Amino acid sequence: MSSDYQHIRFQVEDRVARITFARPPLNVFNIAMMREITAALSESARREIVAIVLAADKDCRAFSAGVAIEEHVQDTIYQMLDSFHAIFRQLEQIAKPVIALVDGAALGGGCEIVAACDVVIASDRSRFGVPEIKLGVFPPVATILLPLVIGEKRARELILTGEIIDAVEAGRLGLCNHVVPGPQLEPKLLEVTAKLRELSGTSLEFARRAMDLGRGRTLDEALSEQENIYLHELMKTADANEGIKAFMEKRKPVWRNR
């Protein structure tokens, strides 16, 4: 186990790496935490493993409630987006199967990480959504991945309305592979990882890379396009800045539609 992290825990056991989000109560991603997740993924790439598990610490009430709103302001927006998207670029680069173990809310950036995982095991109390539009912004990763995972029309509806869905609906849409009672999360995880341990880690990497290539363009290319819109167009609008400011001031935003 590595002890060099403050907001996560990292361990490798029986050819499976586990990255545990440990920033209670809601695992809100700040820049430091996101960089730690990327570092742990990079460390996983150097290990002979068959899978990576992403999960929340038992003391946390959510898988993740998303990226810290206070880091969406002009002073930190570039660092924030770069640090968050580095997670997804690293996931694509290492090409190892990734399993999300979700118990509680996976919202905003938390839901985007779920969408990027190969297998999602969720408790029946879990909730999912990308409510960024209510703050006057949009979720760049979700605009790329959600249509691929759950279909174009439903993805558009979730992104454009900010709707939160329960685990049953997430399972029906294909965002979750397995929805189980909370006590069955770890047993279901053991069942899935047992299947992967019987396989070649190298072959799993090639299979995952082949599926990524089948999308027609890399996630890195798609993210670069979204970053340009987000940073150089959206974040220069009055409404994007008003939405973030209103959230931090705990009031309703006053939209100017510009």
Regions found by a protein language model. Give the residues of each.
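Hydrophobic/aromatic residues within transmembrane alpha-helices
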Residues: 19, 54, 68, 113-115, ...
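A short acidic, glycine-rich active-site loop
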Residues: 73-83
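C-terminal alpha-helix plus adjacent terminal tail
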Residues: 1-14, 23, 44-47, 57-60, ...
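Crotonase-fold acyl-CoA enzyme core
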Residues: 2-4, 92-202, 237, 242, ...
